[in-house]
Amino acid sequence: MRNLPCLGTAGGSGLGGIAGKPSPTMEAVEASTASHRHSTSSYFATTYYHLTDDECHSGVNQLGGVFVGGRPLPDSTRQKIVELAHSGARPCDISRILQVSNGCVSKILGRYYETGSIRPRAIGGSKPRVATAEVVSKISQYKRECPSIFAWEIRDRLLQENVCTNDNIPSVSSINRVLRNLAAQKEQQSTGSGSSSTSAGNSISAKVSVSIGGNVSNVASGSRGTLSSSTDLMQTATPLNSSESGGASNSGEGSEQEAIYEKLRLLNTQHAAGPGPLEPARAAPLVGQSPNHLGTRSSHPQLVHGNHQALQQHQQQSWPPRHYSGSWYPTSLSEIPISSAPNIASVTAYASGPSLAHSLSPPNDIESLASIGHQRNCPVATEDIHLKKELDGHQSDETGSGEGENSNGGASNIGNTEDDQARLILKRKLQRNRTSFTNDQIDSLEKEFERTHYPDVFARERLAGKIGLPEARIQVWFSNRRAKWRREEKLRNQRRTPNSTGASATSSSTSATASLTDSPNSLSACSSLLSGSAGGPSVSTINGLSSPSTLSTNVNAPTLGAGIDSSESPTPIPHIRPSCTSDNDNGRQSEDCRRVCSPCPLGVGGHQNTHHIQSNGHAQGHALVPAISPRLNFNSGSFGAMYSNMHHTALSMSDSYGAVTPIPSFNHSAVGPLAPPSPIPQQGDLTPSSLYPCHMTLRPPPMAPAHHHIVPGDGGRPAGVGLGSGQSANLGASCSGSGYEVLSAYALPPPPMASSSAADSSFSAASSASANVTPHHTIAQESCPSPCSSASHFGVAHSSGFSSDPISPAVSSYAHMSYNYASSANTMTPSSASGTSAHVAPGKQQFFASCFYSPWV
């Protein structure tokens, strides 16, 4: 309830043009008929005169209205809000006229439509009430019996006498507040003995109970002492004269209200078609006025409340007649004049029937007045009061306790069924039902949204005529649809940028740990291609990538026993072993499991001889890269599976391609590095790259061991294997029904099945003339800069570069290399000694071109 604006009319006079005088003794506010504009201080003194100077912390809202932080809106302003709504003003107009925030207007009107009450909800009203009437009476009894009793003693006594339980016992602060309220009531009883008033010669007994925090509740005279007076006037708060105005005269109120309604007419371009300017004499008169005067002066010294009624109107004053006499108000609301008392001017009823009463006082006053024989002046029956109390959820057990300081008054806006029906009609009139769209409408809207996110008014009108919706609803739909699209786009961007932190292996050696971010802007260039189809194997030969030299696949095992020289001869078939045990053949620890460079595509060696893989027990540091999730964004697929827990090694690349970058790869097999035109740098030259990679997604295998290592086919001693041939290398792999795709870029073999044979779960290497491929899925190898240097890649002992021969002139960039590779892969026809025919994927070249010639996703 913070920053709720109080009544702030646009520079008009205060309530009745009062020049308020707040004082510590809360003396009566002197009425003034001056029509001069009030200042802010006097306005505050009028509206919030029950607050002390320390409590009146004012502010100005964006509309220019003033408010007191933490205090509810005054009842007079609430009443004006409801009146303007009944007159047909929109909430935004009401907000501008009264200079009250739009949210406050909407909340007050919504509560009024639902419950018929304009009262604010209790502060902390969601909490259960504990200071009930029974508890308050007990506290009062204990205090009378022992005036020096403490609050905690009262609390203990309430528990001992089973008045309360531990669940609903009031706190010490609540008990102290009740005691303060009781003391204020006692003081009020002693000082306000002559302040009660009557009307039409009928003496009315009433007692005003005043709380310290501004809570005033009217207690029936039958319960406590009688304060009677047959001569004083009884003040009441009509819809335009609430208790905040005190005993103010209404002589200046007509001009103020006329100014408000003139604003409303100007906003709605409707000028008053009914009566002319309203005289101040037609303002809602105070009940109990003598026939010869309208401006009355209150002699009550304790009009101390800003939210509730200070005194109860005995004759139920109806809505002021002048507000329903013009063209503003719906014709369904009839105007039936009723006469209340001999000396009271006739007023018009707000709705059909004489039983409407818009009193804002608590219902127990009306009940008590009815119980002492004044029903003739009160058109509301007691059963109607009880019914309305049930409807409003009013709890009258807070009498004098201060707990119900802002509770809804059950008797407020008590009316008959016609009033309820009129309010429901207003609710249906002012509140629009939520729009339900049909499937055809949604389809049309979505098609238009695909065309443009911001259709102009002509497009919206055309669409409105097509699908039968108002243009305003279409505009709102597009606004909501754009918000939904922005949310989805944000999620898509988050998916494109995964967590770059992975479980990096904890190594005891001097291994440098590098971190990669698998984003399109920060990965190394890794040209990748799917060359195999599900139907049969395909064998590709890289003709344009290297000079007549061997393509070697260096396969690193957990421990490399001896160098294997594979020159012009078939190589052993390496099995994939899904374990990372420490085979201490040459004193090498299980750390070698982490040193396995995985098959970022097959390295092309421009070396005329073969490569030697030697494991002589050297311990050279390898850059370990934490696990990341490589992705491949295919044209038609959206692969989201990731390998997020695999350890990747960093491979060093030649500086001839601009930068030496770590490349994400899986520890399934190791592939030799690409031969650049210049000598390969050493391992220390690892720098980040800005080249774009192909993002590849992998469906996780059914069994995901920590590392896969390749060992010789017979399962004997571990050894590295090199695949090589004089002209080309034909490398294939079979999934043997393992159930996941094999991607060419990573040369990723499937995990072995339990009963698979060596031929089913191995790489099959061929010489230059044949391609021995086990038919199911194939792995096509491709060039990729392999950043492992010659001195540190798998512990290669020789120090010379792999090749100084330049790549063929036709290959000027990665795109050309890839294109030549795709062309050669599509056009070659390998000679198959085993009789298996090569099958090339038809969309391979298209995919490859989309990777390198289309914008990266």
Swiss-Prot record:
It comes from Drosophila melanogaster (Fruit fly). Residues 289-301 have a biased composition (Polar residues). Residues 241-257, 308-317, 404-416, 500-519 have a biased composition (Low complexity). This is Paired box protein Pax-6. The keyword DNA-binding applies. One of its GO terms (biological process) is photoreceptor cell fate specification. Changing residue 641 to T: In strain: 253.27 and closs19. It holds the Pfam family Homeodomain. PROSITE patterns: HOMEOBOX_1 (PS00027), HOMEOBOX_2 (PS50071), PAIRED_1 (PS00034), PAIRED_2 (PS51057). Belongs to the paired homeobox family. Residues 56-182, 430-489 bind DNA. It is found in: Nucleus.
